[in-house]
Amino acid sequence: MTKQELLKTHFGYDTFREGQEAVIDALLAGKDVLAVMPTGAGKSICYQVPALMMKGITLVISPLISLMKDQVRSLNQAGISAAYLNSSLTQGQYFTALRYAKAGRYPIIYVAPERLTTEAFLDFALSADIFMIAVDEAHCVSQWGQDFRPSYLKIAEFVAQLPKRPVIGAFTATATKEVREDIARLLNLRDPFCTTTEFDRENLYFAVKTPKDKYKEVHDYILEHPDDSGIIYCLTRKLVEEVCGKLIQDGITATRYHAGLSDEERRNNQDDFIYDRCHVMVATNAFGMGIDKSDVRYVIHYNMPKNMEGYYQEAGRAGRDGDPAECILLYSGKDVVTNQYLIERGQDNQEMDMETWRLVRDRDQERLKQMTFYCFTHDCLREYILKYFGEYGKSYCGNCLNCQTEFEEQDVTEEAQAMVQCVKESGQRYGVNVILDTLRGASTAKIRQYHMEENSFYSVCAKTPVYRLRQIFNYLVLEEYLSLTDDGYTIVKLTSTSRDLLEKGSMLTMKMPKAQELQKKEKKVRRRKSSTAGELKEQDEPLFQKLRALRTEIAREEKIPPYMVFSDKTLIHMCILKPENEAEMLDVTGVGRHKFEKYGKRFIDAVQNL
């Protein structure tokens, strides 16, 4: 079969996405490849198609067990024989899989990097006809990458032992220039074909918010989107437990994922999410790499991540089916402090000497600063992301909160000076909420406990809305007029430049959003409209729900996630085309020959018998 025929038969697509065909052609021509393609751009097809066209085995080196299982299950659903070799297999299962591999049963084999150096796998590899090695999540080889894994450094050594050097393809979703250079060098790529596809994901809506009550923001959002799947990312395990526990207590079916859970619990919780038994996943960044759930409609970051690379990779897990999805970041000053603490804790990594650790720490601090700037910019959020990765987009995308908000330059000198004076008079001993509650004249338990009613600046900003005070405070932290430290809990401190703000004649202005409350209401209307994916017409909604129910029924029968039957995008296209026969069903995006033979008649019957 040609590459186009393979694409349609097994994957159900009529055309390749941007960048895919050029990568496939390079690999088929025997050239090494370094491909940087954002999450959702279809990296896996770039090595799966050549693997099916060429004689020999393709080894896919992958860092996570969950990633391998998900990919192999998807391939098997598409009628492609594939297997994985990792620590989740019993000894008997492992050697059976190796025996089948030697017999040529699997054109594609996923393997953990730790397995490359084991005696049993080396014996297999030395006698096998390996056409290609695809290194997934290739940024893991670089100590400058956000997920450095020392086991990836063994890949080049493994390749050097093979009797015949295979073609090598390195794939990653996010990589700066330094990381790309590291990947090419550490994997010993030979004159590679390098490509970086456009990072922009036009279907994703970006927003940064600074709510006083993050949990309420998340809770209310989920209630507005009861049928949508979403991920809530938290910085720490403790927060994951806290947020997930509250959601369950409030009647929301949520589950959780972090490294502190047992393997079995993580596996069960992950399955609950991908099988749609549970719509909300609360997790640390340990969750998501390689999880091919295409219908995630929102990703909410409960905290600001450490860097833009991690943020864009995690946010990119929304809307992989191409339909509208939302990426919302909830910022607070404490997030900066927590991330600084996590960066400093990197010193505990025994695999790095002190000099290397310092270099990594300094780089991480710079990345954190760039991430913080993202949270404060009033320019287009999409443009900020693209610029960070070396691309230049429009200065107005129309699909982020900043582009949908009108800003104006406002004088905030009076409020800013009051904040600095309040911190100074109170002895630099309190957190953000105590300072802001003092300025607005609140009478909370802590205000009374600390006798803040006696502070000279108590209630001087009583007429200023609390959201505006919070925006001004965050701006003062960004401009380093105030700082936050972690002395058990977050404390507001003065800086060496605090005094400048108090000098006679000093003035501070900042961009502030206009008519904020009105925009909030408009945003909620926009959300509801975008939640029903794609071009679905109102009269087709009953058919769409019927097809989703059939998909769930089939998924339960076959014990697979619903999105592996057909994606929402495919079901929507069925609602539009309303196929009556095989030829018409094969015109539906995402329906290939193999899946038609398995499911086609049942879906045609469902369409015709509404």
Describe the predicted segments one by one.
Residues 359-389:
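Short, charged low-complexity linear segments at domain edges
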Residues 1-10, 14-18, 22-44, 51-54, ...:
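Helicase motor core with emphasis on the C-terminal RecA-like subdomain
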Residues 1-6, 337-338, 349-353, 363-365, ...:
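Accessory DNA-binding and partner-docking regions appended to nucleic-acid-acting proteins
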Residues 164, 226, 378, 428, ...:
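Flexible coil/turn residues that form the inter-helical turn or adjacent wing/linker of helix-turn-helix
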Residues 27, 222, 273, 375, ...:
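Short helix-to-turn junction characteristic of helix-turn-helix DNA-binding domains
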